[in-house]
Amino acid sequence: MDRIAEDLARDSHSGASEMLVKIASSILDLSDGDIDVVPESDWIAFGIRLHEAKPTIATIFNLANNIMLEAEKGAGSSRRILAMVASMMEGERCSVERIAEAAGSIIEAGRVATSSYSSTVSAALASVAARRPLKVTVAESLPGGEGRLFAKKLTDMGIEAEIVPDSNIYAIMAEMDCVLTGADSVSPHGLVNKVGTRALVEAARSHGLPAYAVCGLSKFSPVTLSDMVVTQIGSTEGPSERSQIFESTPLDRVTCIITEDGALSPSDIKERFHGRTMASGWSSIDL
Protein backbone atom coordinates (compact mmCIF):
# COMPACT_ATOMS: atom_id res chain seq x y z
CA MET A 1 0.00 0.00 0.00
CA ASP A 2 3.00 2.27 0.43
CA ARG A 3 3.52 2.15 -3.34
CA ILE A 4 -0.05 3.33 -3.95
CA ALA A 5 0.46 6.39 -1.73
CA GLU A 6 3.85 7.10 -3.32
CA ASP A 7 2.40 6.91 -6.83
CA LEU A 8 -0.34 9.32 -5.78
CA ALA A 9 2.18 11.81 -4.39
CA ARG A 10 4.06 11.78 -7.72
CA ASP A 11 0.92 12.30 -9.82
CA SER A 12 1.05 15.93 -10.96
CA HIS A 13 -1.11 15.65 -14.09
CA SER A 14 -4.36 13.87 -13.24
CA GLY A 15 -7.50 15.72 -12.23
CA ALA A 16 -9.18 15.02 -8.89
CA SER A 17 -11.71 12.61 -10.36
CA GLU A 18 -9.07 10.72 -12.33
CA MET A 19 -6.87 10.45 -9.22
CA LEU A 20 -9.72 8.87 -7.28
CA VAL A 21 -10.38 6.28 -9.98
CA LYS A 22 -6.66 5.44 -10.29
CA ILE A 23 -6.18 4.96 -6.55
CA ALA A 24 -9.40 2.98 -6.19
CA SER A 25 -8.32 0.71 -9.05
CA SER A 26 -4.91 0.15 -7.44
CA ILE A 27 -6.53 -0.80 -4.12
CA LEU A 28 -8.88 -3.24 -5.84
CA ASP A 29 -5.89 -4.80 -7.63
CA LEU A 30 -4.28 -5.82 -4.32
CA SER A 31 -4.22 -9.61 -4.03
CA ASP A 32 -6.74 -11.36 -1.81
CA GLY A 33 -3.92 -12.78 0.29
CA ASP A 34 -2.48 -9.33 0.95
CA ILE A 35 -5.87 -7.78 1.71
CA ASP A 36 -6.99 -10.39 4.24
CA VAL A 37 -3.99 -9.89 6.52
CA VAL A 38 -4.01 -6.07 6.63
CA PRO A 39 -4.75 -4.99 10.22
CA GLU A 40 -7.14 -2.11 10.93
CA SER A 41 -4.26 0.08 12.15
CA ASP A 42 -2.51 -0.25 8.77
CA TRP A 43 -5.67 0.80 6.90
CA ILE A 44 -5.94 3.87 9.13
CA ALA A 45 -2.29 4.75 8.52
CA PHE A 46 -2.84 4.21 4.79
CA GLY A 47 -5.77 6.63 4.79
CA ILE A 48 -3.64 9.28 6.44
CA ARG A 49 -0.84 8.71 3.89
CA LEU A 50 -3.27 9.12 1.01
CA HIS A 51 -4.43 12.47 2.38
CA GLU A 52 -0.87 13.62 3.04
CA ALA A 53 0.07 12.72 -0.55
CA LYS A 54 -2.58 15.15 -1.89
CA PRO A 55 -3.70 17.31 1.06
CA THR A 56 -5.77 19.73 -1.05
CA ILE A 57 -7.77 17.17 -3.06
CA ALA A 58 -11.28 16.58 -1.69
CA THR A 59 -11.88 13.34 -3.60
CA ILE A 60 -8.79 11.78 -2.01
CA PHE A 61 -9.70 13.06 1.45
CA ASN A 62 -13.17 11.52 1.18
CA LEU A 63 -11.73 8.19 0.02
CA ALA A 64 -9.23 8.23 2.88
CA ASN A 65 -11.91 9.15 5.42
CA ASN A 66 -14.16 6.31 4.24
CA ILE A 67 -11.28 3.81 4.44
CA MET A 68 -10.53 4.92 7.99
CA LEU A 69 -14.19 4.80 9.04
CA GLU A 70 -14.50 1.21 7.82
CA ALA A 71 -11.24 0.24 9.53
CA GLU A 72 -12.43 1.73 12.81
CA LYS A 73 -15.42 -0.63 12.79
CA GLY A 74 -13.05 -3.52 13.53
CA ALA A 75 -13.13 -7.13 12.34
CA GLY A 76 -13.79 -7.72 8.65
CA SER A 77 -12.73 -4.21 7.67
CA SER A 78 -10.71 -5.24 4.60
CA ARG A 79 -13.70 -6.68 2.76
CA ARG A 80 -15.88 -3.72 3.70
CA ILE A 81 -13.19 -1.36 2.46
CA LEU A 82 -12.96 -3.14 -0.89
CA ALA A 83 -16.73 -2.95 -1.37
CA MET A 84 -16.75 0.75 -0.45
CA VAL A 85 -13.82 1.54 -2.78
CA ALA A 86 -15.51 -0.26 -5.68
CA SER A 87 -18.71 1.69 -5.05
CA MET A 88 -16.87 5.04 -4.96
CA MET A 89 -15.01 4.25 -8.18
CA GLU A 90 -18.16 3.31 -10.05
CA GLY A 91 -19.98 6.38 -8.75
CA GLU A 92 -17.15 8.65 -9.85
CA ARG A 93 -17.10 7.18 -13.35
CA CYS A 94 -20.82 7.81 -13.77
CA SER A 95 -21.04 11.21 -12.07
CA VAL A 96 -19.87 13.49 -14.92
CA GLU A 97 -22.45 12.07 -17.32
CA ARG A 98 -25.22 12.52 -14.76
CA ILE A 99 -24.07 16.06 -13.91
CA ALA A 100 -23.99 17.00 -17.60
CA GLU A 101 -27.49 15.62 -18.16
CA ALA A 102 -28.81 17.59 -15.19
CA ALA A 103 -27.05 20.77 -16.36
CA GLY A 104 -28.57 20.47 -19.83
CA SER A 105 -32.04 20.37 -18.31
CA ILE A 106 -31.47 23.20 -15.82
CA ILE A 107 -29.44 25.76 -17.80
CA GLU A 108 -31.67 27.55 -20.30
CA ALA A 109 -29.17 29.90 -21.87
CA GLY A 110 -27.78 30.86 -25.25
CA ARG A 111 -24.87 32.91 -23.87
CA VAL A 112 -22.77 31.58 -20.99
CA ALA A 113 -19.67 33.04 -19.34
CA THR A 114 -17.12 30.81 -17.64
CA SER A 115 -13.46 30.69 -16.66
CA SER A 116 -10.54 28.32 -16.09
CA TYR A 117 -10.54 24.72 -17.41
CA SER A 118 -12.88 21.97 -16.25
CA SER A 119 -13.86 18.68 -17.87
CA THR A 120 -17.12 18.73 -15.91
CA VAL A 121 -17.94 22.22 -17.20
CA SER A 122 -17.17 21.18 -20.78
CA ALA A 123 -19.47 18.15 -20.44
CA ALA A 124 -22.21 20.39 -19.02
CA LEU A 125 -21.82 22.90 -21.86
CA ALA A 126 -21.96 20.10 -24.43
CA SER A 127 -25.25 18.99 -22.89
CA VAL A 128 -26.62 22.54 -23.09
CA ALA A 129 -25.40 22.94 -26.69
CA ALA A 130 -27.16 19.72 -27.69
CA ARG A 131 -30.48 21.34 -26.76
CA ARG A 132 -30.10 24.91 -28.04
CA PRO A 133 -27.69 27.25 -29.90
CA LEU A 134 -24.89 28.24 -27.52
CA LYS A 135 -22.01 30.70 -27.42
CA VAL A 136 -19.54 30.60 -24.53
CA THR A 137 -17.37 33.49 -23.35
CA VAL A 138 -14.28 32.28 -21.49
CA ALA A 139 -12.13 34.48 -19.26
CA GLU A 140 -8.46 33.79 -19.97
CA SER A 141 -7.95 32.92 -16.27
CA LEU A 142 -4.60 34.35 -15.28
CA PRO A 143 -2.31 33.33 -13.68
CA GLY A 144 -1.93 30.30 -15.89
CA GLY A 145 -4.23 31.39 -18.69
CA GLU A 146 -5.89 27.97 -18.96
CA GLY A 147 -9.08 29.69 -20.11
CA ARG A 148 -7.47 29.92 -23.55
CA LEU A 149 -6.99 26.15 -23.63
CA PHE A 150 -10.57 25.67 -22.49
CA ALA A 151 -11.94 27.92 -25.24
CA LYS A 152 -9.92 25.91 -27.78
CA LYS A 153 -11.35 22.68 -26.35
CA LEU A 154 -14.90 24.00 -26.68
CA THR A 155 -14.25 25.05 -30.27
CA ASP A 156 -12.89 21.57 -31.03
CA MET A 157 -16.12 20.17 -29.56
CA GLY A 158 -18.15 22.26 -32.01
CA ILE A 159 -19.25 24.87 -29.45
CA GLU A 160 -18.84 28.54 -30.41
CA ALA A 161 -16.43 30.18 -27.97
CA GLU A 162 -14.59 33.45 -27.47
CA ILE A 163 -11.82 34.52 -25.08
CA VAL A 164 -11.84 37.75 -23.07
CA PRO A 165 -9.34 39.27 -20.62
CA ASP A 166 -10.25 38.66 -16.99
CA SER A 167 -10.74 42.40 -16.48
CA ASN A 168 -13.54 42.40 -19.10
CA ILE A 169 -15.85 40.02 -17.25
CA TYR A 170 -18.03 42.73 -15.74
CA ALA A 171 -18.11 44.71 -18.99
CA ILE A 172 -19.48 41.79 -21.04
CA MET A 173 -21.91 40.45 -18.45
CA ALA A 174 -24.90 42.38 -19.82
CA GLU A 175 -24.67 40.17 -22.93
CA MET A 176 -24.80 36.92 -20.93
CA ASP A 177 -27.70 34.76 -19.77
CA CYS A 178 -25.81 33.10 -16.91
CA VAL A 179 -22.37 32.07 -15.67
CA LEU A 180 -21.12 28.54 -15.12
CA THR A 181 -18.12 27.44 -13.07
CA GLY A 182 -16.54 24.26 -11.82
CA ALA A 183 -15.23 23.60 -8.31
CA ASP A 184 -12.10 22.02 -6.89
CA SER A 185 -13.88 21.44 -3.60
CA VAL A 186 -17.00 22.44 -1.69
CA SER A 187 -17.05 22.80 2.09
CA PRO A 188 -19.52 24.38 4.53
CA HIS A 189 -17.43 27.54 4.18
CA GLY A 190 -17.59 27.94 0.41
CA LEU A 191 -16.73 26.76 -3.08
CA VAL A 192 -13.00 26.68 -3.81
CA ASN A 193 -11.92 27.13 -7.42
CA LYS A 194 -9.45 29.03 -9.59
CA VAL A 195 -9.05 32.70 -8.70
CA GLY A 196 -11.47 34.78 -10.77
CA THR A 197 -14.42 32.54 -9.94
CA ARG A 198 -15.82 34.96 -7.38
CA ALA A 199 -15.49 37.92 -9.76
CA LEU A 200 -17.43 35.91 -12.34
CA VAL A 201 -20.16 35.03 -9.83
CA GLU A 202 -20.42 38.55 -8.40
CA ALA A 203 -20.65 40.07 -11.90
CA ALA A 204 -23.56 37.75 -12.67
CA ARG A 205 -25.33 38.62 -9.42
CA SER A 206 -24.95 42.35 -10.05
CA HIS A 207 -26.73 41.85 -13.40
CA GLY A 208 -29.46 39.69 -11.90
CA LEU A 209 -28.21 36.55 -13.67
CA PRO A 210 -28.01 33.02 -12.30
CA ALA A 211 -24.58 31.73 -11.27
CA TYR A 212 -24.36 27.96 -11.62
CA ALA A 213 -21.58 25.61 -10.53
CA VAL A 214 -21.11 21.98 -11.54
CA CYS A 215 -19.40 19.62 -9.13
CA GLY A 216 -19.52 15.95 -8.17
CA LEU A 217 -20.49 15.03 -4.63
CA SER A 218 -17.06 13.42 -4.23
CA LYS A 219 -15.68 16.97 -3.99
CA PHE A 220 -17.87 17.84 -0.99
CA SER A 221 -15.53 17.95 2.00
CA PRO A 222 -16.54 18.58 5.63
CA VAL A 223 -13.27 20.49 6.13
CA THR A 224 -11.62 23.17 4.01
CA LEU A 225 -8.68 21.51 2.27
CA SER A 226 -7.51 23.69 -0.60
CA ASP A 227 -4.42 25.83 -0.20
CA MET A 228 -5.00 29.19 -1.88
CA VAL A 229 -1.39 29.02 -3.22
CA VAL A 230 -0.21 32.59 -2.82
CA THR A 231 3.26 33.41 -4.14
CA GLN A 232 5.23 36.60 -3.54
CA ILE A 233 8.17 37.44 -5.79
CA GLY A 234 10.48 40.12 -4.39
CA SER A 235 12.50 42.60 -6.40
CA THR A 236 15.42 44.86 -5.52
CA GLU A 237 14.80 47.21 -8.45
CA GLY A 238 11.02 47.49 -8.77
CA PRO A 239 7.71 46.43 -7.29
CA SER A 240 7.27 42.92 -5.96
CA GLU A 241 4.76 40.56 -7.57
CA ARG A 242 1.99 38.66 -5.82
CA SER A 243 -0.04 35.85 -7.38
CA GLN A 244 -2.90 33.77 -5.97
CA ILE A 245 -4.12 30.57 -7.65
CA PHE A 246 -7.31 29.63 -5.79
CA GLU A 247 -10.04 31.46 -3.89
CA SER A 248 -13.20 30.64 -1.97
CA THR A 249 -16.65 31.87 -3.01
CA PRO A 250 -19.33 31.84 -0.28
CA LEU A 251 -22.10 29.35 -1.01
CA ASP A 252 -24.80 32.01 -0.79
CA ARG A 253 -23.32 33.79 -3.83
CA VAL A 254 -24.13 30.78 -6.05
CA THR A 255 -27.63 30.08 -7.40
CA CYS A 256 -27.10 26.34 -7.12
CA ILE A 257 -24.50 23.63 -7.52
CA ILE A 258 -25.50 21.03 -10.10
CA THR A 259 -24.44 17.56 -8.95
CA GLU A 260 -25.17 13.98 -9.98
CA ASP A 261 -28.15 14.24 -7.60
CA GLY A 262 -29.45 17.34 -9.39
CA ALA A 263 -29.42 21.00 -8.36
CA LEU A 264 -28.56 21.79 -4.74
CA SER A 265 -29.28 25.24 -3.31
CA PRO A 266 -26.87 26.80 -0.78
CA SER A 267 -29.13 25.61 2.06
CA ASP A 268 -29.31 22.11 0.52
CA ILE A 269 -25.52 22.01 0.37
CA LYS A 270 -25.10 23.00 4.00
CA GLU A 271 -27.64 20.32 4.95
CA ARG A 272 -25.47 17.75 3.17
CA PHE A 273 -22.73 18.35 5.71
CA HIS A 274 -24.96 17.74 8.73
CA GLY A 275 -24.15 14.39 10.26
CA ARG A 276 -21.05 13.81 8.12
CA THR A 277 -18.82 11.50 10.17
CA MET A 278 -15.09 12.10 10.47
CA ALA A 279 -12.81 9.19 11.30
CA SER A 280 -11.30 9.48 14.76
CA GLY A 281 -7.88 8.72 13.26
CA TRP A 282 -7.67 12.28 11.94
CA SER A 283 -7.02 13.47 15.50
CA SER A 284 -3.38 12.40 15.06
CA ILE A 285 -2.70 15.03 12.38
CA ASP A 286 -3.44 18.71 11.80
CA LEU A 287 -6.20 19.02 9.18
Predicted regions located by residue number:
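Long amphipathic alpha-helical segments
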Residues: 1-85
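Conserved active-site and cofactor/substrate-binding residues in soluble primary-metabolism enzymes
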Residues: 3, 14-22, 38-41, 45, ...
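Short, glycine-rich nucleotide/cofactor-binding loops
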Residues: 10-13, 111-117, 187-192
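Ligand-binding beta-strand-loop-alpha-helix segment within the catalytic cores
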Residues: 65-109, 113, 121, 126-179
